[in-house]
């Protein structure tokens, strides 16, 4: 079982930004995503489409946004569990036990769901 300060479900922009912020305050985290690569919808569906709603960035593409977020994470040791889907989330006292379809188990006090509106499966 993997023990971590936080488990982020979703490796799209919100999940990546959340991982960055957690590491900045000294918390360890792991990220699980059903897709086989980092970036979520931005990289999977519209890597070349302009995005206009990121604060302080007037315009960027999905690929640029993803690459910038990945570059910001490089100084940190973040483990990504790609091509893995969360199958079970269960409360155990003050912790959560999270299990994936590949049999990976996590124990954490914090589960952050960053699946976004573009999640491909319920």
What are these regions (language model features)?
Residues 15-16, 38-41:
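Short N-terminal binding/cap micro-motifs at the start of the first secondary-structure element
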Residues 10-14:
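Glycine-rich Rossmann-fold phosphate-binding loop(s) that bind the pyrophosphate
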Residues 43-105:
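N-terminal Rossmann-like dinucleotide/flavin-binding domain of flavoprotein oxidoreductases
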Residues 27-34, 42:
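Short beta-strand "acidic-cap" motif of Rossmann-like dinucleotide-binding folds
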Residues 1-9, 24-25, 37, 80-122:
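FAD-binding core/adjacent interface of flavoenzyme oxidoreductases
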């Amino acid at each position: 079982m993997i023990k971590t300060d936080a488990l982020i479900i979703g490796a799209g922009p919100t999940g990546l930004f959340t991982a960055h912020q957690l590491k900045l305050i000294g918390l360890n985290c792991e990220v699980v995503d059903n897709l086989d690569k980092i970036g979520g919808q931005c990289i999977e569906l519209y890597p070349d489409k302009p995005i206009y709603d990121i604060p302080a960035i007037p315009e960027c593409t999905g690929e640029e946004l993803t690459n910038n977020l990945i570059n910001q994470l490089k100084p940190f040791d973040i483990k990504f569990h790609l091509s893995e889907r969360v199958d079970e989330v269960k409360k155990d006292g003050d912790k959560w036990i999270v299990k994936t379809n590949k049999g990976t188990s996590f124990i954490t006090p914090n589960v952050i769901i960053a699946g976004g509106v573009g999640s491909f499966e319920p």
